[in-house]
């Protein structure tokens, strides 16, 4: 029998159900700076090896991240950037996206707030013989160490959900993009299917949601040691982009699971993987009702050719 959780434990355990190593050391791919942001960086620093392993794990959480990287690279290739283009990986984490872009002939500037992640990216670049194509450094996403109009493309995977001020980050990313440059990033979906089906998180069940709101911030999941992740709607993302002088070009939702009940994983891993694969195929095919309820959004935005950014 499952052990009943105290309210404070409930707030923590959802992130553990979604990410098997979150309770131990939740990692975050972010480059940041308020008090909450600093706690995120500290945890991220301690979880560098876990974020390296996630791209080879054979479970739902691993498959979602592997699919995220695959879709990201496919979208980048479709942009048709010239060989040798200088691109930004903001919140590079373990460096997997940086490596993939370098392998495709791009010159990558990789930044992250966590020194251990930067070291891991540098190690991977050296091991792959890509030192000349990847420059990795510790830097904050709120104040990037680049002049304006530096890049035709900026990539930021797994960063926005962990930021206290996503607007400031997106505005700063826009600043370093060239006019008509692209920003490719992810955000967590507030209306993900896994949450809609769990009565403890479903917005359709107002009384239970009111109870959950006593232990969670609205639109946030508070994880271990007070770390919060933030979920957004596409309308909110569009507002962030518009304020930063950008517009959304395309988006998809992806990632189905792990499914939970009362913040506990509800399906055996092998069944969860099959459910994810089936639902992801439907979402990729644009199936109504499924295409918009994945766990994350992958979003491609383009900077306006006008240099003005709304204040």
Can you describe what each PLM-predicted range is?
Residues 6-82, 84-93, 100, 120, 182-213:
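Conserved class I S-adenosyl-L-methionine
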Residues 167-179:
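A short glycine-rich, Lys/Arg-flanked "PGG" loop and its adjoining helix->strand segment in the class I
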Residues 94-143:
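Class I SAM-dependent methyltransferase SAM/SAH-binding core
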Residues 158-159:
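Short catalytic micro-motifs in class I SAM-dependent methyltransferases
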Residues 229, 235-239, 249-311:
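A C-terminal cap/extension of S-adenosyl-L-methionine-dependent methyltransferases
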Residues 155:
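A conserved beta-strand element that flanks and buttresses the S-adenosyl-L-methionine
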